[in-house]
Amino acid sequence: MKRLQALMAEQGPDIYPEVIAALKDDPREGAQRLVRQCQTYLKERERQRAVLQRMYNYERQLWSMGYRHIAGIDEVGRGPLAGPVVAAAVILPGEVELPGIEEAKRLSDRRRMELYRRIREVAVAVGVGLVQPEGIDEASVVVATYKAMMKAVADLPVTPDYLLIDGVHLPNVSQPQVPVVGGETLSCSIAAAAVVAKVVRDEYMVEMDAKYPAYGFAHHKGYGTPEHRLALERYGPCPIHRKPSDGTPAGAVLLFTEG
Protein backbone atom coordinates (compact mmCIF):
# COMPACT_ATOMS: atom_id res chain seq x y z
CA MET A 1 0.00 0.00 0.00
CA LYS A 2 2.93 2.35 0.69
CA ARG A 3 4.10 1.79 -2.88
CA LEU A 4 0.68 2.82 -4.18
CA GLN A 5 0.66 5.91 -1.97
CA ALA A 6 4.09 6.86 -3.32
CA LEU A 7 2.82 6.42 -6.89
CA MET A 8 -0.23 8.56 -6.08
CA ALA A 9 2.02 11.33 -4.78
CA GLU A 10 4.22 11.06 -7.86
CA GLN A 11 1.63 10.66 -10.62
CA GLY A 12 -1.45 12.32 -9.15
CA PRO A 13 -5.12 11.59 -9.90
CA ASP A 14 -4.46 9.82 -13.21
CA ILE A 15 -3.39 6.74 -11.27
CA TYR A 16 -6.42 6.72 -8.94
CA PRO A 17 -8.41 4.18 -11.03
CA GLU A 18 -5.48 1.76 -10.77
CA VAL A 19 -5.33 2.28 -7.01
CA ILE A 20 -9.05 1.55 -6.71
CA ALA A 21 -8.70 -1.62 -8.81
CA ALA A 22 -5.71 -2.81 -6.77
CA LEU A 23 -7.26 -2.22 -3.34
CA LYS A 24 -11.01 -2.65 -3.77
CA ASP A 25 -10.95 -6.22 -2.39
CA ASP A 26 -8.33 -5.52 0.29
CA PRO A 27 -10.08 -5.90 3.67
CA ARG A 28 -7.73 -3.58 5.56
CA GLU A 29 -9.37 -0.40 6.81
CA GLY A 30 -6.49 1.73 5.54
CA ALA A 31 -6.87 0.26 2.07
CA GLN A 32 -10.61 0.86 2.00
CA ARG A 33 -10.14 4.40 3.26
CA LEU A 34 -7.73 5.06 0.41
CA VAL A 35 -10.22 3.59 -2.07
CA ARG A 36 -12.97 5.86 -0.75
CA GLN A 37 -10.70 8.91 -0.99
CA CYS A 38 -9.86 8.10 -4.60
CA GLN A 39 -13.49 7.45 -5.48
CA THR A 40 -14.63 10.70 -3.85
CA TYR A 41 -11.99 12.69 -5.69
CA LEU A 42 -12.79 11.13 -9.07
CA LYS A 43 -16.52 11.62 -8.56
CA GLU A 44 -16.02 15.30 -7.74
CA ARG A 45 -13.71 15.74 -10.72
CA GLU A 46 -16.33 14.26 -13.03
CA ARG A 47 -18.98 16.53 -11.52
CA GLN A 48 -16.79 19.58 -12.12
CA ARG A 49 -16.07 18.49 -15.68
CA ALA A 50 -19.78 18.09 -16.35
CA VAL A 51 -20.40 21.58 -14.96
CA LEU A 52 -17.62 23.01 -17.11
CA GLN A 53 -19.05 21.25 -20.15
CA ARG A 54 -22.37 22.99 -19.54
CA MET A 55 -20.73 26.34 -18.78
CA TYR A 56 -18.96 26.37 -22.14
CA ASN A 57 -22.19 25.97 -24.14
CA TYR A 58 -22.34 29.64 -25.19
CA GLU A 59 -18.65 29.76 -26.06
CA ARG A 60 -18.73 26.44 -27.90
CA GLN A 61 -21.60 27.59 -30.11
CA LEU A 62 -19.80 30.84 -30.94
CA TRP A 63 -16.50 29.08 -31.63
CA SER A 64 -18.34 26.80 -34.06
CA MET A 65 -19.59 29.93 -35.86
CA GLY A 66 -16.04 31.18 -36.36
CA TYR A 67 -15.70 33.61 -33.47
CA ARG A 68 -12.36 33.22 -31.71
CA HIS A 69 -11.94 36.03 -29.20
CA ILE A 70 -15.08 35.83 -27.09
CA ALA A 71 -15.02 38.19 -24.12
CA GLY A 72 -17.03 37.40 -21.02
CA ILE A 73 -17.95 40.56 -19.10
CA ASP A 74 -19.19 41.05 -15.54
CA GLU A 75 -19.12 43.72 -12.86
CA VAL A 76 -19.09 44.06 -9.11
CA GLY A 77 -19.81 46.97 -6.81
CA ARG A 78 -23.21 48.29 -7.83
CA GLY A 79 -24.63 48.10 -4.31
CA PRO A 80 -21.98 49.42 -1.88
CA LEU A 81 -22.06 52.76 -0.11
CA ALA A 82 -18.43 53.42 -1.00
CA GLY A 83 -15.85 52.60 -3.62
CA PRO A 84 -15.93 52.09 -7.38
CA VAL A 85 -17.91 49.95 -9.75
CA VAL A 86 -15.43 47.51 -11.27
CA ALA A 87 -15.95 45.52 -14.46
CA ALA A 88 -13.73 42.90 -16.05
CA ALA A 89 -13.57 41.33 -19.49
CA VAL A 90 -11.89 37.94 -20.00
CA ILE A 91 -11.09 36.08 -23.22
CA LEU A 92 -10.37 32.39 -22.64
CA PRO A 93 -8.35 30.29 -25.13
CA GLY A 94 -10.73 27.34 -25.19
CA GLU A 95 -12.31 24.91 -22.77
CA VAL A 96 -9.71 25.28 -20.04
CA GLU A 97 -10.41 23.73 -16.64
CA LEU A 98 -11.15 26.30 -13.95
CA PRO A 99 -12.02 24.29 -10.81
CA GLY A 100 -14.69 25.97 -8.71
CA ILE A 101 -15.62 28.52 -11.38
CA GLU A 102 -19.31 27.61 -11.08
CA GLU A 103 -19.23 29.04 -7.53
CA ALA A 104 -17.32 32.17 -8.50
CA LYS A 105 -19.23 34.54 -6.22
CA ARG A 106 -19.43 32.15 -3.23
CA LEU A 107 -15.79 31.12 -2.95
CA SER A 108 -13.62 31.88 0.06
CA ASP A 109 -11.07 34.65 -0.41
CA ARG A 110 -8.27 32.08 -0.63
CA ARG A 111 -10.00 29.92 -3.25
CA ARG A 112 -11.04 32.98 -5.25
CA MET A 113 -7.45 34.21 -5.31
CA GLU A 114 -6.24 30.78 -6.50
CA LEU A 115 -8.82 30.89 -9.28
CA TYR A 116 -7.90 34.48 -10.12
CA ARG A 117 -4.25 33.50 -10.57
CA ARG A 118 -5.29 30.55 -12.74
CA ILE A 119 -7.43 32.83 -14.93
CA ARG A 120 -4.59 35.31 -15.30
CA GLU A 121 -2.28 32.44 -16.24
CA VAL A 122 -4.44 30.88 -18.96
CA ALA A 123 -6.48 33.78 -20.38
CA VAL A 124 -5.78 35.14 -23.84
CA ALA A 125 -6.58 38.60 -22.50
CA VAL A 126 -7.93 40.31 -19.38
CA GLY A 127 -9.26 43.86 -19.22
CA VAL A 128 -10.45 45.87 -16.21
CA GLY A 129 -12.50 49.05 -15.97
CA LEU A 130 -13.24 51.18 -12.90
CA VAL A 131 -15.70 54.02 -12.39
CA GLN A 132 -15.06 55.93 -9.19
CA PRO A 133 -17.78 57.32 -6.86
CA GLU A 134 -17.73 60.76 -8.47
CA GLY A 135 -18.54 59.12 -11.80
CA ILE A 136 -21.40 57.22 -10.19
CA ASP A 137 -22.69 60.39 -8.54
CA GLU A 138 -22.65 62.32 -11.83
CA ALA A 139 -24.90 59.83 -13.60
CA SER A 140 -26.28 56.68 -11.99
CA VAL A 141 -24.96 53.30 -10.96
CA VAL A 142 -26.48 51.78 -14.11
CA VAL A 143 -24.66 54.23 -16.38
CA ALA A 144 -21.51 53.73 -14.31
CA THR A 145 -21.82 49.98 -14.85
CA TYR A 146 -21.99 50.46 -18.62
CA LYS A 147 -18.97 52.78 -18.50
CA ALA A 148 -16.96 50.31 -16.41
CA MET A 149 -17.79 47.49 -18.83
CA MET A 150 -16.82 49.58 -21.86
CA LYS A 151 -13.55 50.51 -20.14
CA ALA A 152 -12.88 46.82 -19.47
CA VAL A 153 -13.42 45.97 -23.15
CA ALA A 154 -11.17 48.86 -24.21
CA ASP A 155 -8.51 47.65 -21.77
CA LEU A 156 -8.26 44.23 -23.45
CA PRO A 157 -4.93 43.88 -25.29
CA VAL A 158 -6.74 41.69 -27.85
CA THR A 159 -9.81 43.02 -29.65
CA PRO A 160 -12.80 40.75 -28.97
CA ASP A 161 -15.07 39.72 -31.82
CA TYR A 162 -18.03 38.79 -29.60
CA LEU A 163 -19.24 39.83 -26.14
CA LEU A 164 -21.02 37.67 -23.56
CA ILE A 165 -22.33 40.04 -20.89
CA ASP A 166 -23.87 39.23 -17.54
CA GLY A 167 -27.48 40.32 -17.75
CA VAL A 168 -27.26 43.58 -19.72
CA HIS A 169 -27.04 44.84 -23.29
CA LEU A 170 -24.06 47.16 -23.62
CA PRO A 171 -24.74 50.30 -25.70
CA ASN A 172 -22.29 51.92 -28.09
CA VAL A 173 -20.06 48.94 -28.83
CA SER A 174 -19.27 47.65 -32.30
CA GLN A 175 -19.06 43.94 -31.50
CA PRO A 176 -22.05 41.59 -31.58
CA GLN A 177 -23.17 40.67 -28.09
CA VAL A 178 -25.65 38.68 -26.07
CA PRO A 179 -26.82 39.43 -22.52
CA VAL A 180 -26.84 36.28 -20.37
CA VAL A 181 -29.03 36.52 -17.27
CA GLY A 182 -27.25 34.77 -14.42
CA GLY A 183 -24.21 34.62 -16.67
CA GLU A 184 -21.70 33.75 -13.96
CA THR A 185 -23.40 30.35 -13.59
CA LEU A 186 -23.91 29.75 -17.33
CA SER A 187 -20.71 30.94 -19.02
CA CYS A 188 -17.12 30.27 -17.97
CA SER A 189 -15.98 33.48 -19.64
CA ILE A 190 -18.47 35.58 -17.67
CA ALA A 191 -17.69 33.71 -14.45
CA ALA A 192 -13.97 34.32 -14.99
CA ALA A 193 -14.71 38.03 -15.44
CA ALA A 194 -16.72 37.98 -12.20
CA VAL A 195 -13.73 36.55 -10.34
CA VAL A 196 -11.33 39.13 -11.78
CA ALA A 197 -13.67 42.04 -11.04
CA LYS A 198 -14.23 40.86 -7.47
CA VAL A 199 -10.53 40.41 -6.70
CA VAL A 200 -9.55 43.75 -8.26
CA ARG A 201 -12.25 45.62 -6.34
CA ASP A 202 -11.49 43.87 -3.04
CA GLU A 203 -7.79 44.70 -3.36
CA TYR A 204 -8.65 48.32 -4.11
CA MET A 205 -10.85 48.55 -1.01
CA VAL A 206 -8.06 47.09 1.13
CA GLU A 207 -5.83 49.90 -0.16
CA MET A 208 -8.54 52.41 0.75
CA ASP A 209 -8.72 50.90 4.23
CA ALA A 210 -5.10 51.94 4.76
CA LYS A 211 -5.97 55.46 3.58
CA TYR A 212 -9.24 55.75 5.53
CA PRO A 213 -8.84 53.30 8.45
CA ALA A 214 -11.85 54.50 10.44
CA TYR A 215 -14.40 52.81 8.16
CA GLY A 216 -13.27 49.16 8.03
CA PHE A 217 -13.17 48.96 4.23
CA ALA A 218 -10.86 45.92 4.34
CA HIS A 219 -13.64 43.94 6.03
CA HIS A 220 -16.87 45.00 4.33
CA LYS A 221 -15.44 46.37 1.03
CA GLY A 222 -17.75 49.37 1.18
CA TYR A 223 -21.04 47.50 1.58
CA GLY A 224 -23.64 48.71 4.07
CA THR A 225 -22.82 46.50 7.05
CA PRO A 226 -23.71 47.59 10.60
CA GLU A 227 -20.00 48.28 11.18
CA HIS A 228 -19.86 50.53 8.14
CA ARG A 229 -23.08 52.37 8.96
CA LEU A 230 -21.88 53.00 12.51
CA ALA A 231 -18.62 54.46 11.20
CA LEU A 232 -20.58 56.72 8.85
CA GLU A 233 -22.71 57.99 11.72
CA ARG A 234 -19.61 58.61 13.80
CA TYR A 235 -17.26 60.14 11.22
CA GLY A 236 -19.42 61.16 8.28
CA PRO A 237 -18.56 60.23 4.67
CA CYS A 238 -15.02 60.15 3.32
CA PRO A 239 -14.01 61.01 -0.28
CA ILE A 240 -14.76 57.52 -1.64
CA HIS A 241 -18.33 57.42 -0.31
CA ARG A 242 -21.08 57.74 -2.88
CA LYS A 243 -23.90 60.25 -2.71
CA PRO A 244 -27.56 59.23 -2.86
CA SER A 245 -29.48 60.24 -5.96
CA ASP A 246 -30.61 63.52 -4.37
CA GLY A 247 -26.98 64.60 -3.93
CA THR A 248 -27.01 64.52 -0.12
CA PRO A 249 -23.83 63.06 1.40
CA ALA A 250 -24.25 59.41 2.37
CA GLY A 251 -23.53 60.01 6.04
CA ALA A 252 -26.21 62.69 6.30
CA VAL A 253 -28.84 60.40 4.82
CA LEU A 254 -27.92 57.62 7.21
CA LEU A 255 -28.09 59.94 10.19
CA PHE A 256 -31.52 61.16 9.09
CA THR A 257 -33.04 57.80 8.15
CA GLU A 258 -31.68 55.87 11.11
CA GLY A 259 -31.82 58.63 13.70
From Swiss-Prot:
Endonuclease that specifically degrades the RNA of RNA-DNA hybrids. It holds the Pfam family RNase_HII. One of its GO terms (cellular component) is cytoplasm. Keywords: Cytoplasm, Endonuclease, Hydrolase, Manganese, Metal-binding, Nuclease. SUPFAM superfamilies: Ribonuclease H-like (SSF53098). Belongs to the RNase HII family. The gene is rnhB1. It comes from Symbiobacterium thermophilum (strain DSM 24528 / JCM 14929 / IAM 14863 / T). Coiled coil: none annotated. This is Ribonuclease HII 1. One of its GO terms (biological process) is DNA replication, removal of RNA primer. Residues 68-257 form the RNase H type-2 domain. InterPro entries: RNase_HII, RNase_HII/HIII, RNase_HII/HIII_dom, RNaseH-like_sf, RNaseH_sf. It catalyses: Endonucleolytic cleavage to 5'-phosphomonoester. The keyword Zinc does not apply.
